[in-house]
Amino acid sequence: MKRGRLPSSSEDSDDNGSLSTTWSQNSRSQHRRSSCSRHEDRKPSEVFRTDLITAMKLHDSYQLNPDEYYVLADPWRQEWEKGVQVPVSPGTIPQPVARVVSEEKSLMFIRPKKYIVSSGSEPPELGYVDIRTLADSVCRYDLNDMDAAWLELTNEEFKEMGMPELDEYTMERVLEEFEQRCYDNMNHAIETEEGLGIEYDEDVVCDVCQSPDGEDGNEMVFCDKCNICVHQACYGILKVPEGSWLCRTCALGVQPKCLLCPKKGGAMKPTRSGTKWVHVSCALWIPEVSIGSPEKMEPITKVSHIPSSRWALVCSLCNEKFGASIQCSVKNCRTAFHVTCAFDRGLEMKTILAENDEVKFKSYCPKHSSHRKPEESLGKGAAQENGAPECSPRNPLEPFASLEQNREEAHRVSVRKQKLQQLEDEFYTFVNLLDVARALRLPEEVVDFLYQYWKLKRKVNFNKPLITPKKDEEDNLAKREQDVLFRRLQLFTHLRQDLERVRNLTYMVTRREKIKRSVCKVQEQIFNLYTKLLEQERVSGVPSSCSSSSLENMLLFNSPSVGPDAPKIEDLKWHSAFFRKQMGTSLVHSLKKPHKRDPLQNSPGSEGKTLLKQPDLCGRREGMVVPESFLGLEKTFAEARLISAQQKNGVVMPDHGKRRDNRFHCDLIKGDLKDKSFKQSHKPLRSTDVSQRHLDNTRAATSPGVGQSAPGTRKEIVPKCNGSLIKVNYNQTAVKVPTTPASPVKNWGGFRIPKKGERQQQGEAHDGACHQHSDYPYLGLGRVPAKERAKSKLKSDNENDGYVPDVEMSDSESEASEKKCIHTSSTISRRTDIIRRSILAS
């Protein structure tokens, strides 16, 4: 049973090779309708049939011989089911038709310029013209207004004479041909004997050895561009070419300067780098310079071996300090001159071949090279070798001979110039009309008209050519390119120098900043050391006035402030003097009390009256608010003064009070804690408000069980260790050992100004403490029984509601607290002043 279905795809087909239905009528009708919709007026020429492929497919279970079927192993076998392209109506296939098209004479195609390739020395491709050929075909002469006016008049005459008119392009071509032939023939005439060419000059010499003679195998060769004359061996020419020959500089198209002399041009060879050039004669006559290959006479080497003394010589002939000069070979003669300058002035320059095949070069200054004879020179040399003084009788005819020689040279030069000027005046004789007419295929009459006009126009222009010769144009172009490259080289050189200067400046600035940083670090270390020493002296005892003054001066006035808002040094010194005066006054009051035995002065009332005057005066003078963070520091200073007073009275200090470092007090009394039988654990310190903690401490200090104990009572010292409080009992009189405070430099930014309520509470607490303890004795060195000690401890614990304060005061500590209350305002204000001045001074 056949069933119609759409053409199968890769997803519809199964791997088991299921049967495919033929192309049904339904699909055929659909395809035809779609074809008709696409092609309304014409029938389709081809269709895709799938029934042909479907009819060829068989099921796998179909029984056939192996030679009657093919197995489709292609993974893309689904593409077979797309159908076969079958033509339907062969009549609609177009038939080829040919027709003859008439040839159009107009130019149909113009080759764009971008397809014109300049291949250089390579031959152009087929169908293309070399760009140089196109450039040569362009006329180099352009008509001006005068030429156009003359051409108009000439065409009118040609009409009257019945001759064809002359166009502008033909006139330009003829004038260009005249100029080219005139230039070529004139140069040829100058190079020949009739025109005084250099090849036929009898006085010409080699540019290297200055010899006019040539030999077989060592001929004299002339450059066809710069006309220098050199021997083959002198310039390193291995084989003379048959045609023209160019020297190295002309072959490369450069005009360099000699590295050893100021002369331009001549027989030059490059150095090993190829960027610098040296005359061969300069390389031969300067002793330090050598030549790499004697056969090729190049490259010039060992230029760097020339000493600085030779570079510093000034030429006596040209008076220029440029390059390297040589000196006269006569003994005791130091006259210096360039090699090329000596050749130009005709000085005596000898080349002597020694017995050991060594070549010696002898050069003489103008004084010693005036027509010397060989016998005289040999005799003088022998006399100089024998030590005889040099005596050279001067010829009276020498000046006249030199004048005659100069006159002959000037006459020869003038004759040459006259002949060259005559050749330039007779420029028209170097052009042949018949040759020009044949070359351009023009009538002789037309060429003759143009020839007469060309002569007149060139005469008006002072016999100068109307167009620049092509060779000179190329040379000028090469020179311009060389100048551009030289300017770019100078620009890059200056840029390199500027960058080097910037690098040096950057290095120096970096070095300066490093030095400044190291100096600042050293000053900071010195400042910290001075601060530490000052604090240690003030904590340990009474510092000497000299050491205290010197430390303060070094600490506060080490370096003057340079800021616009910084205080003046005079003001800081005045504050420092006032600070020392106040500290000395309070310290004298505290030290004089124990030395006096008067009971009236030792009474609590008198002490309170005497000491209460100072803080009031200081407080009114300063008028500053005392922050809470200074209380611990002031307590430490008050205790230090108390310790110093006890030392004056002979009171024995405990051993554990002498500390050399800033370790916590718990580390120092750890050994004592092990020996104590009474141990009690306390709660850790809670992070409560600072004001609450201060109130608790004040309440503990002013309690009756602690503050009003009899003299001789013994109290427990509770040191602070790692956030917990520990009470330690001592068998002897306990004195509070002040801990070394931290350096104020580290806590400069940690000051907190207390609020208004806290200030009032602190003021009230301090006033109450001061009035309550005003009747206490100064020292309590007796002992308290154990019962009273237990009572006071129990009462203190009950009043604190289970909270243990940071420090519980002993009798000596209570007295220190009195002094702290008395000196609080004055000492804290002075402490604030010194820290503020330290900040400003730094």
Swiss-Prot record:
Sequence ranges of Basic and acidic residues compositional bias: 787-798
InterPro entries: Enhancer_polycomb-like_N (IPR019542), EPHD (IPR034732), Histone_Mod_Regulator (IPR050701), Jade-1_PHD (IPR039546), Zinc_finger_PHD-type_CS (IPR019786), Znf_FYVE_PHD (IPR011011), Znf_PHD (IPR001965), Znf_PHD-finger (IPR019787)
Biological process according to GO: apoptotic process; chromatin remodeling; negative regulation of canonical Wnt signaling pathway; negative regulation of cell growth; negative regulation of G1/S transition of mitotic cell cycle; regulation of cell cycle; regulation of cell growth; regulation of DNA biosynthetic process
GO molecular function, a single term: transcription coactivator activity
Phosphothreonine modification, residue list: 92
Region (Interaction with KAT7/HBO1 and histones): 60-80
Tissue specificity remark: Highly expressed in kidney. Also present in pancreas, liver and heart (at protein level). Down-regulated in renal cancer cells.
Interaction with histones: region residues: 80-188
Keywords tagged on the record: Acetylation, Activator, Apoptosis, Cell projection, Chromosome, Cytoplasm, Cytoskeleton, Isopeptide bond, Metal-binding, Nucleus, Phosphoprotein, Repeat, Transcription, Transcription regulation, Ubl conjugation, Zinc, Zinc-finger
Localisation: Nucleus; Chromosome; Cytoplasm; Cytoplasm, Cytoskeleton, Cilium basal body
Positions bearing N6-acetyllysine: 609
Major subcellular location class: nucleus
GO cellular component: centrosome; ciliary basal body; cytoplasm; cytosol; histone acetyltransferase complex; nuclear speck; nucleoplasm; nucleus
Cross-linked residues, Glycyl lysine isopeptide (Lys-Gly) (interchain with G-Cter in SUMO2): 114, 573
Zn-finger segments (PHD-type): 203-253, 313-369
Zinc fingers (C2HC pre-PHD-type), renumbered ranges: 255-289
Disordered: annotated span: 1-43, 366-398, 589-613, 678-715, 787-825
UniProt keyword annotation of Cell wall biogenesis/degradation present: no
Modified-residue entries (Phosphoserine), positions: 89, 603, 703, 743
Alphabetized SUPFAM superfamilies for the sequence: FYVE/PHD zinc finger
UniProt subunit comment: Component of the HBO1 complex composed at least of ING4 or ING5, KAT7/HBO1, MEAF6, and one of JADE1, JADE2 and JADE3. Interacts with NPHP4.
Its biological purpose: Scaffold subunit of some HBO1 complexes, which have a histone H4 acetyltransferase activity. Plays a key role in HBO1 complex by directing KAT7/HBO1 specificity towards histone H4 acetylation (H4K5ac, H4K8ac and H4K12ac), regulating DNA replication initiation, regulating DNA replication initiation. May also promote acetylation of nucleosomal histone H4 by KAT5. Promotes apoptosis. May act as a renal tumor suppressor. Negatively regulates canonical Wnt signaling; at least in part, cooperates with NPHP4 in this function.
Family, as annotated: Belongs to the JADE family.
Domain-level remarks: The 2 PHD-type zinc fingers are required for transcriptional activity.
Protein name from the UniProt record: Protein Jade-1
Gene name of the encoded protein: JADE1
